[in-house]
Amino acid sequence: MKSKKGLVAASGSDSEDEDSMDSPLDLSSSAASGKRRRRGNLPKESVQILRDWLYEHRYNAYPSEQEKALLSQQTHLSTLQVCNWFINARRRLLPDMLRKDGKDPNQFTISRRGAKISEASSIEAAMGIKNFMPTLEESPFHSCVVGPNPTLGRPVSPKPPSPGSILARPSVICHTTVTALKDGPFSLCQPIGVGQSTDVPQIAPSNFTDTSLVYPEDTCKSGPSPNPQSGLFNTPPPTPPDLNQDFSGFQLLVDVALKRAAEMELQAKLTA
């Protein structure tokens, strides 16, 4: 009889230890005695229902919210108790179940904490790769665009004359200047840095002179052609020139250009 009572007592203690992990910890203490209360055990029927569900879903032992609510109704436990039981069961009961099936518990997610750590490491790796990728904003393309923006370079064009050297027919001169720029060669320009010289290289005056504008009969009537160095396309001096300067050479060039334009219009009408 004594041996039977000892066996019953031992089995009872084992069952209590086994069921003790099924209940959450009770850390509340009484103010008078200061001793910790003995934690209570969940009902065996409720624990068996939870064990059966854990065994059926041992490869993915994470019940959804609907399943937790259903288990709470079946076991007559609160949802918090069901959640705590599964948290402990995944660490204590699930590895033994997987080993009995011949599976490695390390290949299955026992706790969500490991999954969060792996996700965080993958996100950090992706962010590290992104930081090393160069962007177009960090390395802009420098190109030369003809426009008023001074940071992109300066096109090769003559400087405007000073106010004292304005001619009587500025529209014709602007037209011939644009034509000469179209006929002249283009050169690449680069952004000018701080401290560099801002002088634009001069282009030979022959590039801006159209020899087809002058004919033998025109030279006989008008006399010798003016000196190309007279200052039409050259850079003006820093100080304004004398107001009494002779501009007969410029006027002669304008007259020749107007005459040539009239001849071209007449030829166009005849051919049409």
UniProtKB/Swiss-Prot annotation:
Annotated segments matching region Disordered: 1-41, 216-244
Cellular compartment(s): Nucleus
Principal localisation: nucleus
GO cellular component: nucleoplasm; nucleus
Known DNA-binding region: 35-97
Domain of life according to the entry: Eukaryota
Motif (CTBP-binding motif): 24-28
Gene3D superfamilies assigned: Homeodomain-like (1.10.10.60)
Keywords, in A-Z order: DNA-binding, Homeobox, Nucleus, Repressor, Transcription, Transcription regulation
Low complexity: compositionally biased ranges: 22-33
CDD domains noted in UniProt: homeodomain (cd00086)
GO biological process: amacrine cell differentiation; cell population proliferation; cellular response to growth factor stimulus; determination of left/right symmetry; dorsal/ventral pattern formation; fibroblast proliferation; negative regulation of cell population proliferation; negative regulation of gene expression
UniProt biased composition (Polar residues): 222-233
Sample GO molecular function, one term: JUN kinase binding
Entry-linked SUPFAM superfamilies: Homeodomain-like
Role played: Binds to a retinoid X receptor (RXR) responsive element from the cellular retinol-binding protein II promoter (CRBPII-RXRE). Inhibits the 9-cis-retinoic acid-dependent RXR alpha transcription activation of the retinoic acid responsive element. May participate in the transmission of nuclear signals during development and in the adult, as illustrated by the down-modulation of the RXR alpha activities.
Subunit structure: Interacts with SMAD2. Interacts with CTBP, SMAD3 and HDAC1.
Protein name: Homeobox protein TGIF1
Species in which this protein is naturally found: Mus musculus
Source organism phylogeny: Eukaryota, Metazoa, Chordata, Craniata, Vertebrata
